[in-house]
Regions:
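Conserved histidines in hydrophobic membrane contexts and catalytic metal-binding motifs
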Residues: 1-224
Length: 224
């Protein structure tokens, strides 16, 4: 039984390992997204820092001219500060769900600074959306989302199972050999990551496609 439990713990770790790595990497990138976007889309996001901004109607007219007037105006996100551009979004039937074409206009110079596909009415930029897709589905569509959900479902089993194995097999005497040192390092990392893995599993399932829907139904049933 102990041997099978160890094998199961090993295979679960092997299964969820890629998910943990990608989720940690994309999560870190997501935190740094504002700085990355400012560097990658600098020209589109910034305009003249001195002068008088022109009316929104004039900025929209410039954007409509860039689209040749063939697209329906969807949303406008005015420049939040001097030196930044206005984001004007148009509905484009050739794009995916919740996607729109954004024209970035310098409100002072009335010049188009960028033209790209964005997401949502707030105009989420492509980099942030790519990181979000990678975090949710590993860029593999529904198959990736299913794998992510399965990995999150088994993560708490791996974490608590590892603690149970440690409790059942910890040596009575402290031995200083390579095997015990390796095992001690593994146990130390396991204890250190235990709370994080449990929270990661719970929050991951809450936001997942299938389990998340069931969580929403449960919350509605209990009035949470």
């Amino acid at each position: 039984v102990l041997f099978r439990s160890r094998r199961l713990h090993f295979y679960i770790g092997l299964f969820i390992g890629p998910f943990i790595f990608v989720a940690a990497l994309t999560g870190t990138l997501y935190v740094a997204t504002p700085q990355l976007e400012n560097w990658l889309y600098h020209d589109a996001l910034h305009g003249l820092a001195e002068g008088t901004p022109q009316p929104l109607s004039a900025q929209i007219a410039v954007a409509e001219e860039a689209t040749q007037g063939n697209l329906r105006l969807l949303a406008v996100r005015p420049a939040p500060a001097l030196g930044e551009t206005t984001r004007i979004m148009f509905a484009d039937p050739g794009l995916g769900e919740s996607e729109s074409r954004a024209i970035f206009v310098d409100p002072i110079a009335l010049r188009v600074k960028g033209d790209m596909t964005v997401y949502g009415t707030s105009g989420i930029l492509p980099l942030r959306q790519w990181i979000d897709y990678a975090h949710r589905s590993l860029l593999l569509g529904d198959s990736g989302r299913l794998y992510s959900e399965l990995a999150a479902s088994w993560m708490w089993v791996a974490a608590l199972g590892g603690i149970a194995l440690w409790a059942m097999t910890r040596p009575k005497r402290r031995l200083n050999n390579a095997l015990q040192n390796h095992r001690r390092l593994h146990v130390t990392l396991g204890w250190g990551l235990l709370v994080g893995m449990l929270l990661f599993s719970a929050t991951g399932l809450t936001w997942s496609q299938w389990a998340g829907g069931n969580v929403d139904k449960m919350r509605a049933a209990f009035g949470w």
